[in-house]
Amino acid sequence: MWLSTFLALLIFVECVIVVYIPAYIESKLSKIKKNRFFNMENFENIASGAILALAFLHMLPEVIILSNKKNMNLYYIFILVLVSVTFLNITDILYDHHFESTFDVNCTLACENSNNQIKNINDKEITTNYIDIKSNEVIDLELKAMDTNINNNNNNNNNNKTDPCKTNIFFEIFKSNSFFIVLSLFIHSFIEGLLMGSLKDKNAIIIVGLSMLAHKWAECLIVYKNVVNKIENPLLASIYAWSFILSLPLGVFIAIFSFPSNEFVEIIFSSIACGFFLYLSFNMTKEIKITKSNKHFISFSYFLGVGGMSTLMILFNSFESNNII
């Protein structure tokens, strides 16, 4: 019991650090000269590769082994994976469409009109054959007045036209796919906690706990990328983040006191989580801008994540098979 509790505490600390530290690191990196390798793009790229390896070498084999024990057809597993990938694609497309449709066209038109007015004033100034100090002062006053009016109009528009998504927390929940990602990760981590808490052999507990410590950081970066860094409502972002952070320790404590892991439930949600991981592995890289100077670093960081996580998973799988540590 104490060993499972200690490992659950370590995983809890790891999750808190990896979910919240990247925002601090990103703000620090933005203030210094950008390094071609040590930047958030490459760190996220490493996480993307690690998530891909995690899906293929940890989740999918685990689900296949459990399904064979339950005499389930593998087609059901792959259907669940395919449905989860398709579902996330649809919700992500809807989120992008909503984001584009909320673009403030009126503000853009006001800025264009102000630029045209400034251009007309400058044209009048150029066509004048003489330079009068008083006329220049008048033009300056007109420009300042225009800027003041534009700022006031923008402030009024921002005050009067509040985004309903920001004021309605229930609409914010289903505005993007963050809810479904966190729900899947919560259930997956909760089941992992049930598994670790229901183990009795110390060697098995250590192997499973260290394996979770080795790969949990990749899941935390998913939460950072898709929740902490994406959701505008800070209260909702905190609820999502802490739900994920507490999911594994909660599963451990419940398993210790009463409720063991259920293999059928584990098959379903591990299959869904596997599909989510496959999708997110490629989705996290879609905003990366590849240039001539960084293309080699982008490729290297991705395969570093794949190779590093693959090595860790193969190592811990061999420990599990041999039951040694």
Curated annotation (Swiss-Prot):
Cell compartment(s), UniProt: Cytoplasmic vesicle membrane
Main location: membrane
Xref: Pfam families: Zip (PF02535)
Highest taxon listed in the record's lineage: Eukaryota
GO molecular function terms attached to this record: zinc ion transmembrane transporter activity
InterPro entries tied to this protein: ZIP (IPR003689)
Membrane topology: Multi-pass membrane protein
Induction, per UniProt: Expression is modulated by the levels of iron ions in the environment.
Disulfides per UniProt: none
TM region positions: 5-25, 46-66, 74-94, 179-199, 239-259, 264-284, 296-316
Annotated function: Putative transporter for the divalent zinc and iron cations.
Protein name: Putative metal ion transporter ZIPCO
The organism's taxonomic lineage, starting at the top: Eukaryota, Sar, Alveolata, Apicomplexa, Aconoidasida
Gene field: ZIPCO
